A protein has these predicted regions:
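Short hydrophobic segments within beta-strands
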Residues: 11-12, 80-82, 121-123, 130
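A glycine-rich helix N-cap at a beta->alpha junction
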Residues: 95-112
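Short, electropositive alpha-helical surface patch
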Residues: 85, 89-97
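Glycine-rich phosphate/adenosyl-contacting loop at the front of the ribokinase-like
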Residues: 2-80, 90
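Short secondary-structure boundary/capping elements
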Residues: 58-65, 88, 110, 138-143
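Short, hinge-like loop/turn segments at secondary-structure boundaries
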Residues: 27-28, 96-98, 122-124
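Conserved phosphate-binding/catalytic loop of the ribokinase/pfkB sugar-kinase fold
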Residues: 104-108, 117-144
Length: 144
């Protein structure tokens, strides 16, 4: 019997998590409900990103995070998700591979950028997420 290449293959949204600190006034200025997750469009994510302070950028998304966790526990994991040929796409691909997860999906050229989630952490530790799905849902119908 042939050896299996992977223990688990995950399919999901390839999202770059951008984690930074802010205060309640920052959230109010952008009408971001504290402690919630909201989907936003590209102009909003760009405005928030430009206004926020220093941040940590790392590959994320629930399925990608699960595959990284599996790999960290010694499993053989692969991830299928769409990124664009842009800086955030490069960050996602680098980080997921560095976590030991196989990621071979070709980056989309031109058009919609890579998905990202700005995770704003207030002094009390509350997280507020603003997520732009970007290119990740494009061509999703091919999977179903």
């Amino acid at each position: 019997m042939a050896e299996t290449r992977f223990d688990v293959v995950g399919i999901g949204n390839a999202i770059v998590d951008i984690i930074g600190r802010c205060d309640d006034d920052f959230l109010a200025r952008f009408d971001a409900p504290k402690g919630h997750m909201r989907l936003v469009e590209e102009p909003t994510i760009r405005e928030l990103y430009d206004a926020m302070g220093p941040a940590i950028e790392i590959s994320g998304g629930s399925v990608a995070n699960s595959m990284a966790g599996l790999s960290g526990l010694g499993g053989k994991a692969a991830f299928i998700g769409k990124v664009a040929k842009d800086t955030f796409g490069e960050i996602f691909a680098h980080d997921i591979r560095a976590a030991g997860v196989s990621f071979e999906t070709a980056a989309a050229d031109g058009g919609t950028p890579t998905a990202r989630s700005l995770i704003l952490v207030t002094p009390d530790g509350e997280r507020t997420m603003n997520t732009f799905l970007g290119v990740s849902p494009e061509d999703g119908c091919l999977l179903y």
